[in-house]
Regions:
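Active-site-proximal beta-strand elements of phosphoester/diester hydrolases
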Residues: 1-9, 123-129, 205-207
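His/acidic metal-ligating clusters that form di-metal
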Residues: 99-126, 131, 135-189
Length: 233
């Protein structure tokens, strides 16, 4: 079975409970659409668990990007802390130079997206989804080529893409060539939705149901793509 999750944010306990709930095994695959770190207290044990399991695939989110830039000396402690990175930074600052270098290599190698096909359905898995300034339309179909559009956005400014919320505000006339699955923006805050449930839009699915917004009713979601079954912890 193939599963997707997103925005776990250092909550290893809820993540592990989810794996138990879905009976995750070595025969399954799990794609995590970014933001495994920050805002929670179990950031590095979550990262290590994902790193060591070959059937769990992490896609880069804006918080992995901040982590990477901090290790490179580009993002300051103050900036990272302001974005929720304090607990992660405290863990990281105690690591050896070699361990930091290993983590940096891992973060730099994370993909921005993955394409998968299940039962003749094509899905484009990514963290934020879309940047309105980069829209490449296939002249034959009139559809936005999402992979080429994201490639262009990332080549121009990876940070702007990973932090973008544009997919939630696009005009109705815009159609994509693949079904997009995203995290990044909690469904609790989607206009005219505001629920801690997976959101199914006409053009995209949002699986960030606000795990680090539990004071607002948020929770961790997991979607099984083979049959559309939803799980929550």
């Amino acid at each position: 079975m193939i599963y997707v999750m997103s925005d776990i944010h250092g909550d290893f306990q809820s993540f592990y409970k989810m794996l138990v709930k879905i009976n995750f095994s070595s025969y399954d695959e799990l794609f995590i659409l970014g933001d495994i770190v920050d805002k929670g207290k179990e950031n590095l044990c979550l990262l290590d668990f994902i790193w060591k399991n070959e059937n769990i695939y992490l896609i880069k989110g804006n918080h992995e990007y901040l982590f990477e830039r901090y290790l490179q000396g580009i993002v300051t402690a103050e900036i990272w802390d302001a974005c929720g990175g304090t607990a992660t930074r405290w863990e990281v600052d105690r690591l050896s130079v070699d361990k930091k270098a290993d983590i940096l290599m891992f973060l730099k190698g994370l993909p921005i997206y993955r394409n998968i096909t299940i039962k003749d359905k094509s899905y484009f898995l990514t963290h934020s989804g879309y940047h309105a300034d980069f829209e490449i339309i296939d002249p034959k179909t009139g559809l936005v080529d999402i992979q080429k559009s994201v490639d262009g956005a990332v080549a121009w400014d990876q940070e702007q893409y990973l932090f973008s919320n544009d997919i939630h505000y696009i005009p109705q006339k815009i159609k994509f060539d693949k079904r997009i699955i995203v995290g990044h923006y909690a469904t609790l805050f989607l206009a005219e939705y505001r629920q801690a449930n997976i959101y199914y839009g006409e053009r995209y699915i949002d699986i960030d149901t606000g795990n680090k917004r539990r004071n607002r009713g948020g929770r961790l979601a997991c979607l099984r793509l083979n049959d559309g079954r939803e799980y929550y912890v």
